[in-house]
Amino acid sequence: MIKAIRSAISFLTTLPLGGDVEELRKNLWLFPYAAILIALIVSVPHFIRNFVDIRFLALVLYLGAEGINHVDGLADFGDALFAPKNRKREAIKDLNTGAGGVAVVVVYFLLLYTLLYRSDFWEIALSQVLAKYSMLLLMLLSRPSWDGMGSYFMEKISSKDVFIGAVPVVLLCYKVGIESLAALASGFAVVLLLKAYSEKHFGGVNGDVIGSANCLTFAASLSALTIAGQL
């Protein structure tokens, strides 16, 4: 189990803990749990907000903790989103990032720059856990578009992973309160929309789409919590 935990943290963050991808495939339910560590790192600015520009620091810590793998997937998905209908599949497989991908990533960073400042630790933790949980749901509910990293994990995903992975989601929803319903709704909406769009245009889901689910759910959940908190 220790090896599986190290593998999850190493795969989902930039922390060089080693591990084995094959071991992670057997324990995909660890995704939401590893997200709590990312939330702790990203929340550091809230403890030193009187000394630094925490908006910029929070964004830097987020990228430092999670790395750019999922952001890279978001960029590829952004290229496909803006590509002509007959070239969407080609665009998401292209290794070069185009204007569409850059635009989507810039908007994503701007959202985080604003939202991380307005969110407390529990809201960030819930949003991070939901982001990873959305990856599990998308893998369970979808079919792979082609062979790759996405299909590699989707071969092993099971209802057990989704069930065990739901525990931190439930606990954090209880802690955050009624506003968590807005975050849950936004997360499920992202999963359903990505599934429908990807199966229509790509024939299924690949690693880039799964990575996009992480980014889009994180931003959508933070947005939903911010709006719900002001109502």
Swiss-Prot record:
It catalyses: alpha-ribazole + adenosylcob(III)inamide-GDP = adenosylcob(III)alamin + GMP + H(+); alpha-ribazole 5'-phosphate + adenosylcob(III)inamide-GDP = adenosylcob(III)alamin 5'-phosphate + GMP + H(+). One of its GO terms (molecular function) is cobalamin 5'-phosphate synthase activity. It is a multi-pass membrane protein. It is found in: Cell membrane. InterPro entries: CobS. It is an enzyme of class 2 (transferase). Its main location: membrane. It comes from the Archaea. The keyword Iron does not apply. Joins adenosylcobinamide-GDP and alpha-ribazole to generate adenosylcobalamin (Ado-cobalamin). Also synthesizes adenosylcobalamin 5'-phosphate from adenosylcobinamide-GDP and alpha-ribazole 5'-phosphate. Belongs to the CobS family. This is Adenosylcobinamide-GDP ribazoletransferase. It comes from Archaeoglobus fulgidus (strain ATCC 49558 / DSM 4304 / JCM 9628 / NBRC 100126 / VC-16).
